Amino acid sequence: MMDAVAPASDAGPDLAAIAADASGERAVGRPTVYVYEAPVRICHWVNAFSIIVLMVTGYLIGTPLPTVAGEASDNFVMGYIRFAHFAAGQVLAVFFLTRILWAFVGNHHSRQIFYIPVHRKQFWKEVLHEIRWYAFLEREPKMYVGHNPLAQTAMFTGFTLFVAFMIVTGFALYSEGQGIDSWQHKLFGWVFAIWPNSQDVHTWHHLGMWALVVFVMVHIYAAVREDIMSRQSIISSMISGERQFRD
């Protein structure tokens, strides 16, 4: 299941690895591996754009712009912001669901962000190694075809769980305006059984936004850092689908 790669610079190509696809098999000695399929990459960038729109519009909804003079119909800025927030939320929900469905039919790497192999001691040993690497306590990085164990843990908790929470609470809040007969209320109205006070749901939804802001900043930093320091492609891999090992 683990897809660690530690290609030695003086090692020759491994023919078995060259014949392997990105299904989780080792790819020692292979400079380029096709990892992220097109649906994974499309969902990644659509979700990323949607989350950015949701963050900006969500912040403005929580901290509205100053009131301006004149007819409301002539100054509908907050209305447009609210509409953009709702639209981006529905786009995120559709592509997040698509991403989940693709995990059932895609390759091994398409499933990594949806689980953590908590029962595997080796996984946690490699998580600790990655923490030491990010803390500049390790001299050499380990290379992986897909996500490294720390990244897999971060993606599962910081993306999968957080985004699911935001979608559920977001649609629950949206159902208040749609009414109890709406599909949003029928699917997500149970949230108010947990937090009967609507303001509590607003508060948790707002806190979730800031948690995602932190995750996005760490995610971008880690991707850029690994692209430079670990000598393997990270950012371009989510464009081309291929992981390149430079050393």
Curated annotation (Swiss-Prot):
Question: Its GO CC terms?
Answer: plasma membrane
GO annotations under biological process?
Answer: respiratory electron transport chain
Which family is this sequence assigned to? Belongs to the HupC/HyaC/HydC family.
Organism, by scientific name, is: Bradyrhizobium diazoefficiens (strain JCM 10833 / BCRC 13528 / IAM 13628 / NBRC 14792 / USDA 110)
Q: Name one GO molecular function term.
A: electron transfer activity
Q: Which UniProt keywords apply?
A: Cell membrane, Electron transport, Heme, Iron, Membrane, Metal-binding, Transmembrane, Transmembrane helix, Transport
Write down a Pfam family by its short name.
Ni_hydr_CYTB
InterPro entries in the record: Cyt_b561_bac/Ni-Hgenase (IPR011577), Di-haem_cyt_TM (IPR016174), Hydrogenase_cytochrome (IPR051542), Ni-dep_Hydgase_cyt-B (IPR000516)
Q: Where in the cell is it found?
A: Cell membrane
What is the protein name stated in its UniProt record? Probable Ni/Fe-hydrogenase B-type cytochrome subunit
How does the record say this protein sits in the membrane?
Multi-pass membrane protein
Query: What task does this protein carry out?
Result: B-type cytochrome involved in electron transfer from hydrogenase to oxygen.
The family database entries (PANTHER family) matched by this protein are listed as: NI/FE-HYDROGENASE 1 B-TYPE CYTOCHROME SUBUNIT, NI_FE-HYDROGENASE 1 B-TYPE CYTOCHROME SUBUNIT-RELATED
Q: Which residues form the signal peptide?
A: none
User: Transmembrane segments in this chain: where?
Assistant: 42-62, 86-106, 154-174, 204-224
Mainly localized where? Answer: membrane
